Amino acid sequence: MAKFLSQDAIQKFKECFSLYDKKGKGKIPAGDLLTVMRCLGTCPTPGEVTRHLQVHKIGKDGEVDFSTFLTIMYRQQKQEDPENEIMVAMLMSDKQKKGVIPLKELRAKLTQMGEKLTPEEVDDLLKGVKVGPDGMVKYEEFVRQITLPVPDY
């Protein structure tokens, strides 16, 4: 799986992995896998981590070597596609398939569903979003805007 990851990503993963490799054996405790993965920006659930370990036949008291860790991270990153998840949710709301959603409805969804955002958080998300004269937002542009990578200063 390493061939699918950039050298920068592998280096970043190695640095974090090494922090949890307390014995210096090139392995981390399976119990630390969730924490290490989250430190590197993925959001696995405990159930997903358990499944990753099961796939590699590693018990919860076992250890994960770096090669296996790279495979797990690759698979986790591949399944976590926030842009696609949000687009699917928007498409489900767009009964007429016009590519737009009323700003009022978008605001309501963001504050009342899923991981509920505060009105202030929604205001921040909506900064710079183009709203048509009819009060409609092109949700593809909105999704692209909110899923842009965070600048690394």
Curated annotation (Swiss-Prot):
Keyword Repeat: yes
Keyword entries, A-Z: Cell projection, Repeat
Assembly behavior: Associates with the IMAC/intermicrovillar adhesion complex.
Gene Ontology BP, a term: brush border assembly
Segments traversing the membrane: none
One example GO MF annotation: calcium ion binding
PROSITE patterns for this protein: EF_HAND_2
Function text: As part of the intermicrovillar adhesion complex/IMAC plays a role in epithelial brush border differentiation, controlling microvilli organization and length. Acts as a light chain for MYO7B and is required for efficient targeting of the IMAC to the tips of border brush microvilli.
Every EF-hand domain range: 8-43, 44-79, 81-116, 117-152
Subcellular location as annotated: Cell projection, Microvillus
UniProt organism field: Xenopus tropicalis (Western clawed frog)
Name the record gives this protein: Calmodulin-like protein 4
Short name of any one Pfam family annotated for the protein: EF-hand_6
Family that this chain belongs to: Belongs to the calmodulin family.
InterPro entries attached to this UniProt entry: CALM/Myosin/TropC-like, EF-hand-dom_pair, EF_hand_dom
GO terms under cellular component: microvillus
Cross-referenced SMART domains: EFh (SM00054)
